[in-house]
Amino acid sequence: MLNILPLLQKALRLSDNAKITKHPSGAVNDVYRVQDEGNDDTSSSADYAVKWLGNDTFSGVNRTHQFVLQQQLHSLDIAPRAIWLSDDETLWVEQWQPNIKVAQAKPETLANVLARIHQLPITARPLNLIERWQHYINVANLEPNDSLYLHAISLRSKVIKSEQDDNDLVLCHNDLLASHVLCRANDIPVVIDWEYSAMGNRYFDLASCCLINKLSIEESTALLQCYTTILGISFDEALAKFQLHKEIVSVTNDLWFKALGQSEAE
């Protein structure tokens, strides 16, 4: 386990009684919980989630922008409060979410959360998939004759058109695993891991959610049906757009893993 507690004690003014424990995390970042009951002469206490981002050399995520975005999301009661980001952007601290449980990967639950996110009155930076794809291609050192590279190029015009559709341009989470949805006592969920959030096409977010949660065709259809019912969108029109974005999401996912694999090999 990384020895990051001394740095956190200084940055967050923690007491000598502060304790750190490692928690399950994703493929790139390490996650810790820091708890501090304070010293004998103070009643202050703290409970933080800490992400070590130093292993991420490939994603191209603008951490400072995402930090400010999460502060806005917290003000709307849908994300933990972002507290501190180190100058080198390798350490991210946010409030730990107490007394919670992870949501079940039910299509209806995920549809409701996505519908809520997509209606938030927040404007973030655009996803800009073409630029992101090119970044992954560069990191992965894909050759112009690589089948994945050619697949991405063949979708270029459709991706550009997708991101110019104002009717479907919304704030997207873009990484909505069921484990990123935490249930609270008031039944209003809080969502974590917003690092890939951006303004994008709602159907990219929907298709991404279905892919990473490994939903079946039937479950994906149920999610889309519930989502369109909530927002009053034509299901037939939504289904056609969803099918296109399933392919776009698949290419994005493959490029991401190619870039990750190359960065780990270096």
Q: What annotation goes with each model-predicted range?
A:
Residues Y203-I233, E247-S263:
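Active-site activation/catalytic loop segments of kinase-like enzymes and analogous catalytic loops
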Residues L2-S15, I122-N174, S179, R184-N186, ...:
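An alpha-helical support segment within catalytic cores of ATP-dependent transferases
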Residues A240, L244-E247:
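Start-of-helix signal in alpha-solenoid helical-repeat scaffolds, especially tetratricopeptide repeats
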Residues N55, N99, P189, S197-M199, ...:
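Activation segment
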Residues P24-D36, D41-A49, K158-F204:
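Active-site acidic catalytic loop and adjacent metal/ATP-binding pocket
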Residues L14-K22:
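Conserved N-terminal boundary motif of the eukaryotic protein kinase catalytic domain
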Residues H23-P24, V28-L127, S147:
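ATP-binding pocket architecture of kinase catalytic cores
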